[in-house]
Amino acid sequence: MTTASSKVAIKPLEDRIVVQPLDAEQTTASGLVIPDTAKEKPQEGVVLAVGPGRFEDGNRLPLDVTVGDVVLYSKYGGTEVKYNGEEYLVLSARDVLAIVEK
């Protein structure tokens, strides 16, 4: 797979992807506002850029995700990056647990 990107000038290498985390719920079902200190880290995000894949035995292995996919990822996986005032997460493809089909 060739490197694809959307809306972001970050080009991931090898089997890495750039994800924009989706915002966590701001209120409970009963209408209570959840303070920032009580919110869990989001584990869902939109794929904005995909690396070309990693090499194994001389062959490049393509990734299972594409730009625009909504993915679930490991709670503590990846590296948080702030670029041009936006927050992104750079993940290894191994940190992606599932693709959400909506």
Curated annotation (Swiss-Prot):
Question: Where primarily located?
Answer: cytoplasm
Membrane-spanning parts: none
Indicate whether Membrane appears among the record's keywords: no
Q: Which pairs of Cys residues are joined through disulfide bonds in the record?
A: none
Q: Where in the cell is it found?
A: Cytoplasm
May I have one GO cellular component term? cytoplasm
Give the GO molecular function terms: ATP binding; metal ion binding; protein folding chaperone; protein-folding chaperone binding; unfolded protein binding
Q: Which InterPro entries match?
A: Chaperonin_GroES (IPR020818), Chaperonin_GroES_sf (IPR037124), Chaprnonin_Cpn10_CS (IPR018369), GroES-like_sf (IPR011032)
Taxonomy, superkingdom: Bacteria
Q: What's an example Gene Ontology biological process for this entry?
A: chaperone cofactor-dependent protein refolding
Signal peptide span per the entry? Answer: none
DNA damage as UniProt keyword: no
Keywords for this protein:
Chaperone, Cytoplasm
Q: What does this protein do?
A: Together with the chaperonin GroEL, plays an essential role in assisting protein folding. The GroEL-GroES system forms a nano-cage that allows encapsulation of the non-native substrate proteins and provides a physical environment optimized to promote and accelerate protein folding. GroES binds to the apical surface of the GroEL ring, thereby capping the opening of the GroEL channel.
Would you identify the family this protein belongs to, as annotated? Answer: Belongs to the GroES chaperonin family.
Q: Subunit composition?
A: Heptamer of 7 subunits arranged in a ring. Interacts with the chaperonin GroEL.
Full protein name: Co-chaperonin GroES
User: Could you tell me which species this protein originates from?
Assistant: Streptomyces avermitilis (strain ATCC 31267 / DSM 46492 / JCM 5070 / NBRC 14893 / NCIMB 12804 / NRRL 8165 / MA-4680)
Gene (UniProt): groES
